[in-house]
Amino acid sequence: MYTVSDIVSSKIESYCRTWRMELEDTNSILTGDKIVSASSTAQSTSLSDDIELGAVCSQSWNMTISDTETAFLGKEYDTYLYLVDYETSGILAGEKIPMGRFTCVKSKKSGGSVQLTMADRLYFSDKPYVPHIPMPNWNKAVEDDICRQLGLQNGNDYTEVRLLRDKNGRRLIDKNGKVLYSKYFYFKVSSLPKDVTMRQMLSYLASAQGQFGYVDRYGKYVRKWYGKSVKTLDNNTIDLPTLSERQNAIVGIICKVSDDETLSLGVTDTTQGRVLEFENPYMTESLLQSLWRRIGGFSWYTTELYHRLGDPRFDIGDVVTYTNGADSYDIPITNLGFTFDGGLSADISAVGLSVEEQL
């Protein structure tokens, strides 16, 4: 969740607010009065009904702009949202909230406006991966290489050696009682699967570490997994959510390493709960044990939620809490879509199996 000043935070949660959007490239700034409307899509899973290890999804914006003179196609823009200061008509507290760095991939003029589709650099990742580095090599080198080819900065920190902890903050220890550190996430990429794409390779590298990948607000490629709740939603700002009757709970994982090798941990009987199944030719027993200690038991409700007062501080993969006064529900944001037209609203969802599918 992005952090802002107290004055901006208070205004975000107020019904008395006006938003503006801004596009900025190296040569110009397209100001808010020309951006008529916009809508975004972002997700941490490529599946329609389940969370996913190793999902690497691009984010995008569709915009309507009252500017038919500018050539947008192929240009890269830093995108911002800001609140209007009613006293000065300027930017409240001088704070612009970065929403990402996007390339214009489609541009269509109609009347006095132009419709744009803006996407982050992962949009181009479905091309075959041709290494620009010697192979075999370490996973970090492969991830760096793909990011360079896509025009991204790798925002994942491999240099900081730190204790690994589970979702409750407990230290992770292997079966021999040895404390695990982040540096153990280095592993060798010995060869490449036939016709593998850059997106698929990033997916393998992410799922091996129990994460998904995306491009953050600053145009950097990062990985994460769902953590603790970052905010309790104000019931005055949302419509009543649609919630599944039962929780989804991860009880096991199954990884297909090759046609001849499959690794698993936990319960593999799908009638007992959610069993995450995925493929990764680089998975090892130690990597699987490490990621299982962090994601095993993770639970959530399938949720659809309309946030009337959209909050641009939320990031994909954040966890928010909904409470009805009696019960509280943690909601991992797997899908996040903003709608801007001077106001700002958001559709938030946590995908998962329906009640019928859980039986």
Range-by-range predicted roles:
Residues 1-134, 190-193, 202-210, 215, ...:
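Assembly/oligomerization scaffold segments
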Residues 28-40, 94-103, 232-242, 266, ...:
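Short amphipathic beta-strand/extended segments with alternating polar/hydrophobic composition
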Residues 51-55, 290-291, 347:
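Short secondary-structure boundary/capping segments within folded domains
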Residues 87, 91-93, 108-244:
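Charged- and aromatic-enriched interaction segments used to assemble
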Residues 281-299:
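Intrinsically disordered, low-complexity segments enriched in Gly and acidic/Ser/Thr residues
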